[in-house]
Amino acid sequence: PASKWGRASTSLPMLIAEELGVDISWRPILVGGIFNTVNPSVYAQRETPVPLKARYMKKDLADWTRSAGLSIKMPPTVFPVNSVKAMRGCAWLEPQGKLVAFATATFEAYWRDDQDISQVPVLTAICRTAGVDPDAFFAGIDQQPVKDQLKANTDEVMARGGFGSPTIFVDKTDMYFGNDRMP
């Protein structure tokens, strides 16, 4: 939920999957963990952006979100945001079949509504929007197996060559990076 490009890429795979009759296996990751481990240059680019590239990326994001029917407020008030609790929530909700509803509500709260998704009251409201019991959610995201699963997902995407978000695998091994790279 912390990646604007991740937000721009969520609706297209669902449409493609529906059209082709295939399933999507969503795997929550900690993009900050990936950046810290294999792609720390992201931080330097944030500190010293290339003005022409930054202007183009803003236009490109606006084009993608408009074509997907999404609204994104740029820049969000809190950026980067600590998305650990939200991503643990995605990991906890994945086996319950509620990951997509929760992730969608989280993306909208952060990118559309400019809310700080690291805050408990915001996550509580997101849970309610997604039909998730907030008390069970906060108990669930504190469980060690949930933390371990999120770390394992993050480690796995790096082991498979991933360096950011969105990273998409087709047929388990064919990797694509970026919302505009889907086959």
Locations of regions flagged by a protein language model:
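Structural alpha/beta surface segment adjacent to cysteine/selenocysteine redox centers
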Residues: 8-113
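C-terminal cap of thioredoxin/glutaredoxin-like
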Residues: 2-26, 105-183
